[in-house]
Amino acid sequence: MSKILLAGRRILKSKKFVVFGGATLIGAGLYYIDATNEDRFRRQMQNHFGITQTAHADILTELNKRPSSALPPRSELIKSLKEEEYDILVIGGGATGAGVALDSTTRGLKTALVEYDDYSSGTSSRSTKLIHGGVRYLQAAIFGLDLEQYRMVKEALFERANLLEIAPHLSYPLPIMLPVYKLWQVPYFWFGIKMYDFVSGKRVLKNSYFITKAQALERFPMLKKESLKGAIIYYDGQHNDARMNLGIVLTAIRHGAKAANHVKVEKLLKNENGKLCGARVKDMITGAEWNIRAKCVVNATGPFTDSIRMMADPDTTPICLPSAGVHIVLPGYYSPFNTGLLDPSTSDGRVIFFLPWEKMTVAGTTDASSELTFSPSPHNRDIEFILSEIRNYLGKDVSVRRGDVMSAWSGLRPLVRDPNKKDTKSLARNHIIEVSESGLVTIAGGKWTTYRHMAEETVDAAIKAHNLEPKNGCVTPGLLLDGAHNYDPLLYIHLVQDYGLEVDVAQHLANTYGDRAFVVARMCKMTGKRWPIVGHRLHEEFPYLEAEVYYAIREYACTAIDVIARRMRIAFLNTYAAHEVLEKVVQIMGKELNWSSAECRKQLEIARNFIDREMGQEARMQSVSEVALNLTKEEMQTAKDRFNQLDRDRKGHITVNDIRRHFRDHGEKIDERLLHELLNEVDLNKNGELELAEFFQLYSGLKNGQIAQNRLVRYLDELQPVSVNRSGGGI
């Protein structure tokens, strides 16, 4: 500690003190200028549409009573969308669109929502999983004398606290470690993080603190030891983003909103005065088309903002610039003791988070301009960049391999220009709300954490622009989301004791569905075993149950992807496991939704393509093709001998028939679907055949760690299945 104090004295005598001391005064000044934010917010709540504090409390108390009725089926919601007229029609079922629907319906406005794909199918399910105020925004606010950025942080910290309060089953405080490798940075970073606590005020999650080098290495043993001076631990929020998004939608529906996923807007409708009066939509499941009548249309489509704006006005100037951010998932041992890691300055000037999530580790993100697409896919170069940055922060004795990447995804950020500013080149730092001449209300930009505040301002703008008549003001601060009403951290114990579920399964159900977990538990079938009594797993290494597929249909899952990617998160956690549960998921859905055998095959094909393209399987194959051959003569001969064992006919390539025959000759019967998967995983040029060059490439990748493991090689070596949650997820 004495070294740190000496470093502090040097700072006082150096030029850094001008910055450091000036920053202190600026930070205090900024806080003083905006210290009345919370009081001002309370006054707004009291005066909004004449609502009093008592009336607001009464309304919120009534709304926070746990709804006892079941969710209406999708067919009933579609029927309402066809027959009724609405005050507000929201286009987009991501976090912001769902937030607008919830805010609108709880003000007493008749509300409809349509989503082209599934709820949270786009950007909202592909985040870093953090609920944060933005440490780097605060740094910019202090050193850049930027009051706007300071207020953004203040707003985000309020919303962070609110999210943790209204959905405690889906969100929680997460400790994040900031390693320090230069002595002068200890007081510098300590001050910045303490300012973060200070600005949080009463809503601070837990106070930050400094730990020594020894304590940091004890908590994060894989951390690079050289030059480490210590670390600062601070707290932000973390959540299950897709489930949170769904929770907002379900809450809106329970409060009266009519929402439907897989409904595409074909065109916007205008009256004789050129003002919007609804939309022509198409049900992508049934093919049915109809008009939805509405007094106001809200565009909350994220990266696709301009496509809806151009429906209203073909000559409008685009404002959205999609930017792609890639994340990867690694095994859980990369984030020990449930602690995250922050790299505050990567080689390209960004920050990278390294966070525990769902018993795995999420790392990201990158930032690059992108084409607008409904199916963004991660590129291998972005994955390699993240791995490279991780290696910089971990010890030399820790081998971070490409094959350790279990899954990877790309999400599009909706960066926007403010159309109200003359400088059209500059991007808006926060969200923007635009009301067009035809009456389209567009909300664009922003971030996950502030979705509720964005929704509130959007509904305010819609009410003003269209003279709508709400029954009360905004009541979403403190409004509990679906599953939160009777949730407590020990709920899972009741699931274990009352239903006979395994502990990890019970914890998963409680942390996914909150107090609705009991409904899922009652849907579980008897196992016929002494323990667990109920609950058939979809996959032996993950806590997901077959009963959850049935429940997912109640939550408006319409496709296999809806289930594996968003109702459950297995596609985001491990692509091999996702492939392995897919057939069972389709079998259950097919039975429940009366799918034909052709539809079941179609669902399987679409879901497999989704896993391969959007969850990183193709990028993994790309990494294999880029591996330089580095085999010795003996290793090449071993690989060639193994190849010839399979290619008995000396065709020069291996087919599914060769692999099937090899297993049969060894007395092993293997599933036909698995046979095709094994070949597809190593077939680099996707021609249905495995050539000798590809076989060499496979062995070379296994040798240098570019590939952590491969199922075909292991099957051939041992002729027995291997764990998918091993050190790496395959090629």
What name fits each language-model region?
Residues Y86-L113:
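N-terminal Rossmann-like FAD-binding beta1-loop-alpha1 element of flavoenzymes
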Residues T105-S127:
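Glycine-rich FAD pyrophosphate-binding loop
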Residues N261-C277:
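A conserved short coil-to-beta-strand element within the FAD-binding core of flavoproteins
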Residues S120-K154:
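Glycine-rich active-site loop/strand segments that organize a redox cofactor
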Residues K3-I4, D117, L170, M177, ...:
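C-terminal accessory subdomains/tails of enzymes that are appended
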Residues E84-Y86, I285-C296:
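Core beta-strand elements of the Rossmann-like FAD/NAD(P) dinucleotide-binding domain
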Residues V90-I91, I292-G302:
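Short hydrophobic core segments
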Residues S2-I88, T106:
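Extreme N-terminal leader/targeting segments of oxidoreductases
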